């Protein structure tokens, strides 16, 4: 083959590309991770060529066997792209023609790199959103397992990072699990929207050969085919949406990680990290650092950067395909890899932590966290809440002045603040009473928390089933 036609696009050129163009144009090494997905699309396209009459049954069988052989050799590390392989598609066509001769060159008919690359990334993402979901479910399971052990472990709840009201520790852990439940729901919703094959769009106008791509779409596990050939090759909103979901997941992980940095500090002393999930200092022998939490917190910014990078690339691109779109894979591969590093480490840290229940309880009433109980006690006895709030504020001021806790206020002090404050109010000023009072749906009362755990387990089981019931291509 001549120098001008080594590449898939070289036929109309009198000379090959400059070294600078070749270096810029060649896809990064990491993009060749899409090879198995390109092979899956190629096998489906071979069937479409047979249906179109360009391949007979034996040729199709030979083609698919060769593609399977390339896949096996690639997975085993027996073959690798060369510097002359401009991209995944060139790499596979070179190997196919080396093994099959002229027959290998037939596979290109009826398709373009434009619909191929769009298909490769969709297949990669549909596979990996399930892998990611499994890891998120493992982290959620660790949170739920810890929550089950601490349904009655009372701790302070916070607003503005100030102690606010007593809650059970399980309730706090489950709040993180609930946010991640939505992360997986977003992956599931995304997958339903993305389950459309772009094959058959060819360069942008549609294929004059592969005119019935519904069967190949079904073989690849898609629910259907993209409605518009231009949209199929030009749009990457599904990629940006995935990167948003990855960013939101990273942010939710980062919030949990931030709390572990606080909880494991000497100032909080809420949790002790297992030695296998903490590090030390090169100069301070006493240190036990929450590096997993800190690294997870830091990588959230990386995930957000991948999203904003792609959004900036997509801005103002005219229809249809533009080479700018080749940047779509950078953020995807990095975000997937980042999350697959962070999630197992976070799950292990959560699963192995030791909770200091006594310290949680000691801190629970500090900062007058039971003050709302006084206001509620007055309100249910007919005092307008505006007045109840003011009366309770005056009681807090008096207790601060006399260095008392709320439940230590004498009947005389209570009456001095307001005659409607009788000694009976002190029955409400226990941690157990405050917790038990929050017995409405979604509240922190232990029975409500147990019911929440049951519902959450049911939801997690359904999400786990979704990860397993996939008919598309998976590595």
Curated annotation (Swiss-Prot):
One of its GO terms (molecular function) is argininosuccinate lyase activity. PROSITE patterns: FUMARATE_LYASES. Its EC number is 4.3.2.1. Its main location: cytoplasm. One of its GO terms (biological process) is L-arginine biosynthetic process. It comes from the Bacteria. Pathway: Amino-acid biosynthesis; L-arginine biosynthesis; L-arginine from L-ornithine and carbamoyl phosphate: step 3/3. It catalyses: 2-(N(omega)-L-arginino)succinate = fumarate + L-arginine. One of its GO terms (cellular component) is cytosol. It is found in: Cytoplasm. InterPro entries: Arg_succ_lyase_C, Argininosuccinate_lyase, Fumarase/histidase_N, Fumarate_lyase_CS, Fumarate_lyase_fam, Fumarate_lyase_N, L-Aspartase-like. It holds the Pfam family ASL_C2. Keywords: Amino-acid biosynthesis, Arginine biosynthesis, Cytoplasm, Lyase. The keyword Cytoplasm applies. NCBIfam families: argH. Belongs to the lyase 1 family. Argininosuccinate lyase subfamily. This is Argininosuccinate lyase 1.
């Amino acid at each position: 083959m001549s120098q001008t036609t080594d590449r898939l696009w070289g036929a109309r050129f009198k000379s090959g590309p400059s070294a600078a163009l070749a270096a810029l144009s060649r896809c990064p090494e990491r993009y060749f991770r899409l090879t198995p997905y390109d092979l899956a699309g190629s096998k489906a396209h071979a069937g479409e060529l047979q249906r179109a009459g360009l391949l007979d049954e034996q040729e199709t069988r030979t083609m698919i066997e060769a593609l399977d052989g390339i896949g096996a050799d690639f997975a085993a590390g027996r073959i690798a792209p060369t510097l002359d392989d401009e991209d995944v598609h060139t790499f596979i066509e070179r190997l196919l023609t080396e093994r099959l001769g002229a027959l290998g060159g037939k596979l290109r008919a009826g398709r373009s790199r434009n619909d191929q690359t769009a298909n490769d990334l969709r297949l990669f993402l549909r596979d990996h959103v399930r892998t990611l979901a499994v890891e998120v479910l493992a982290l959620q399971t660790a949170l739920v397992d810890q929550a089950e052990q601490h349904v009655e472990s009372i701790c302070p709840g916070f607003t503005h990072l100030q102690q606010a009201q007593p809650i059970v520790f399980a309730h706090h852990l489950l709040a993180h699990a609930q946010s991640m439940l939505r992360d997986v729901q977003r992956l599931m919703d995304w997958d339903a929207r993305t389950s459309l094959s772009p094959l058959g769009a060819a360069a942008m106008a549609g294929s004059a050969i592969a005119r019935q791509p519904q069967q190949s779409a079904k073989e690849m596990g898609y629910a259907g085919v993209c409605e518009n050939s231009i949209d199929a090759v030009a749009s990457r909103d599904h990629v940006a949406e995935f990167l948003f979901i990855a960013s939101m997941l990273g942010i939710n992980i980062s919030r949990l990680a931030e709390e572990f940095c606080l909880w494991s500090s000497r100032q909080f002393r809420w949790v002790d990290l297992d030695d296998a999930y903490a590090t030390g200092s090169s100069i301070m022998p006493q240190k036990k650092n929450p590096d997993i939490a800190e690294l997870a917190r830091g990588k959230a910014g990386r995930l957000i950067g991948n999203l904003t990078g792609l959004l900036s690339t997509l801005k103002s691109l005219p229809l249809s395909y533009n080479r700018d779109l080749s940047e779509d894979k950078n953020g995807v591969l990095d975000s997937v890899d980042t999350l697959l590093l962070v999630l197992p480490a976070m799950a292990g840290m959560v699963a192995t932590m030791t909770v200091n229940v006594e310290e949680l309880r000691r801190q629970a009433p500090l900062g007058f966290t039971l003050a709302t109980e006084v206001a509620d006690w007055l309100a249910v006895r007919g005092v307008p809440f505006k007045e109840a709030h003011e009366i309770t504020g005056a009681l807090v001021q008096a207790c601060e002045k006399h260095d008392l806790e709320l439940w230590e206020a004498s009947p005389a002090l209570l009456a001095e603040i307001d005659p409607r404050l009788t000694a009976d109010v002190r029955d409400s000023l226990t941690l157990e009473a405050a917790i038990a009072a929050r017995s409405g749906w979604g509240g922190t009362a232990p029975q409500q928390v147990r019911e929440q755990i049951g519902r959450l387990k049911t939801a997690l089981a359904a999400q786990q089933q979704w990860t397993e019931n996939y008919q598309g291509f998976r590595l």
